[in-house]
Amino acid sequence: MYLLQLLFWIRLFRGIWSIVYTGTSVTLSTDQSALVAFCGLDKMVNVRGQLLFLGDQTRTSSYTGTTEILKWDEEYKCYSVLHATSYMDCPAIDATVFRGCRDAVVYAQPHDRVQPFPEKGTLLRIVEPRVSDTGSYYIRVALAGRNMSDIFRMAVIIRSSKSWACNHSASSFQAHKCIRYVDRMAFENYLIGHVGNLLDSDSELHAIYNITPQSISTDINIITTPFYDNSGTIYSPTVFNLFNNNSHVDAMNSTGMWNTVLKYTLPRLIYFSTMIVLCIIALAIYLVCERCRSPHRRIYIGEPRSDEAPLITSAVNESFQYDYNVKETPSDVIEKELMEKLKKKVELLEREECV
């Protein structure tokens, strides 16, 4: 029973472990702001969460908006548009954003390895994660009629290990193109300042991609990949040597990798360890209090019987035992005399009747 109570409290504290990012138009709820995965070992990376309307984030009867997934590469100071979807005529039926929309158009999807699956509660999914997928990912949400957009950032770290090697050539990483920008802070301000479809409103991006929009249903998964014609303005890193002459990075000897893992996993490990210790202490205090509150009562078995002791030894009737040494009271003497007089009078009456 106590084990079940302990598991209940652990699950309760685990259930409230959620991060909420509040924007001007929408709110993002997720259970993780950073992920660490290993190439070859993890076949898929999922960032769980959902977009919500909370608090005073007002809504009309219907709305239109866009969601984009972008990646920032800190090493090369560039960003990539990984996925973008435009939603039209979405009814405000509940707190979930972009649910039950009349139509949705995917207008940017360079490859199908990075996709959102909002109907499954997945903000971002990376299939077959690679070392080049490491970076800061942004989910940008823009609603029509608003003067700014909301961006939500999360970190994804992919490393190779000694036991599980990445079987991706260096050329495969170069296929992922980037667009130069000043720095990450300027890039975030750039995203917030744009309203509406990022690719449609940005002339530079619109010139880079030849968009072929495809209408899809909001009830099915987005799996199509439109064609893109890359122009010369795209920044493609000329030196992207992740393997160091095709030799895999040994995660066990990588100081930076261990620092990253400790940075994101150690706080959670300390949190859960502390909660388990507190639950054990609370359980021990509860058991001690229960034992002190309901002690074992002693059973009365009476005093040892002697020859001169009365026969009554019950704990209940102990106060009613007869004491043979107690003298008669005056009332007892009067009653005795009355009884004797009454007896003599009865005998006298019987004699008179006989005569």
Curated annotation (Swiss-Prot):
Topology within the bilayer: Single-pass membrane protein; Single-pass type I membrane protein
Cell membrane recorded as keyword: no
Cystine bridges: none
Keywords attached to this entry: Glycoprotein, Host cell junction, Host cell membrane, Host Golgi apparatus, Host membrane, Membrane, Phosphoprotein, Signal, Transmembrane, Transmembrane helix, Viral envelope protein, Virion
Pfam family, one: Herpes_gI
Protein family per UniProt: Belongs to the alphaherpesvirinae glycoprotein I family.
Name this protein carries in UniProt: Envelope glycoprotein I
Organism from which the protein derives: Gallid herpesvirus 2 (strain Chicken/Md5/ATCC VR-987)
Protein's gene: gI
